[in-house]
């Protein structure tokens, strides 16, 4: 492990921050009436879906981005065209391994979590981002 190059305590802190953001995101989604089906679903080297949920008869694949206040990039700006394509591929794989598409289809959402220096976290949910 090389300290200062993304390893060690910094990596643990980022992982903990990401998990905290995903917990806040799951609460936001369930508070909006969705059912969380799975968290951190991995598909080999293809990647991971942060949250898989159901919104009525729609399957929701949700990317969660958590940032500290003052970070360079706002969390809602984090879904690039490449990331959107990867999420679509992951959604297809999840559907294949879980019995097919639901009647309402699939939607890709983004939850951005901003953790300010002081005060409560800010959680934003954008539907149908990709």
UniProtKB/Swiss-Prot annotation:
It comes from the Bacteria. InterPro entries: Restrct_endonuc-II-like (IPR011335), tRNA_endonuc-like_dom_sf (IPR011856), UPF0102_YraN-like (IPR003509). Pfam families: UPF0102. GO terms for molecular function: nucleic acid binding. Transmembrane segments: none annotated. HAMAP family: UPF0102 (MF_00048). NCBIfam families: PRK12497.3-3. PANTHER family: UPF0102 PROTEIN YRAN. Belongs to the UPF0102 family. This is UPF0102 protein SCO5602.
